[in-house]
Amino acid sequence: MARIAGVDLPRDKRIEIGLTYIYGIGLTRSQEILAATGVNPDTRVRELGDQDVAALRNAVAGYQVEGDLRRWESMNVKRLMDIGSYRGRRHRAGLPVRGQRTRTNSRTRRSAKRTVAGKKKAPSKK
């Protein structure tokens, strides 16, 4: 099993897909890395040689991935909260940050709705 950037890549996947298991590397960046290192994207992870793995490690080391990227993102959010910007206040309140509506929807960000058992709607007066 190839270990790159502290992540064990799945042995049976193509290396193009396997690299996307590293936080911060998507399909496009994976393809860029493979083109730069000269590794065939259709190669399975288990078929990689030691030289290929070393070349991939060096290429991935040039990007901000995994723990460093997570830390960078959390520091940016913390900075927004500390300066008291609108986005920071929305993060702190656990509400959508990018202008989505909240009267309806936004359940993921606001937490699941709890229904009270036995509570009925008031009968409508006619």
Swiss-Prot record:
SUPFAM superfamilies: S13-like H2TH domain. It comes from the Bacteria. InterPro entries: Rbsml_uS13_C, Ribosomal_uS13, Ribosomal_uS13-like_H2TH, Ribosomal_uS13_bac-type, Ribosomal_uS13_CS. GO terms for biological process: translation. The keyword Secreted does not apply. GO terms for cellular component: cytosol; small ribosomal subunit. Keywords: Ribonucleoprotein, Ribosomal protein, RNA-binding, rRNA-binding, tRNA-binding. One of its GO terms (molecular function) is tRNA binding. Residues 100-126 have a biased composition (Basic residues). Transmembrane segments: none annotated. The keyword rRNA-binding applies. Pfam families: Ribosomal_S13 (PF00416). Residues 91-126 are annotated as: Disordered. Located at the top of the head of the 30S subunit, it contacts several helices of the 16S rRNA. In the 70S ribosome it contacts the 23S rRNA (bridge B1a) and protein L5 of the 50S subunit (bridge B1b), connecting the 2 subunits; these bridges are implicated in subunit movement. Contacts the tRNAs in the A and P-sites. Part of the 30S ribosomal subunit. Forms a loose heterodimer with protein S19. Forms two bridges to the 50S subunit in the 70S ribosome. NCBIfam families: uS13_bact. Belongs to the universal ribosomal protein uS13 family. This is Small ribosomal subunit protein uS13. It comes from Acaryochloris marina (strain MBIC 11017).
